[in-house]
Amino acid sequence: MFQPDKQILLEIVKNQMPFGKYKGTLLCDLPVSYLEWFLRKGGFPEGKLGIQLSTVYEIKSNGLDEILWTLKKMK
């Protein structure tokens, strides 16, 4: 079962997309279609951003958006 890192969860509700069409958008607010685009183009970027984006994708694609909403309220 997918178990995201607690620190990563906190980061995805605070950090913004640093480039591209959704530059400045909170990572947790990125649409699934944009995350799927990364996958079609060969995958998420390397490093921490890639881990954050893949975490957002896993949460959203499995219908667990409530996790993100709860964390956003807490920040």
Language-model features: locations:
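DEDD superfamily 3′-5′ metal-dependent exonuclease/proofreading module
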Residues: 1-75
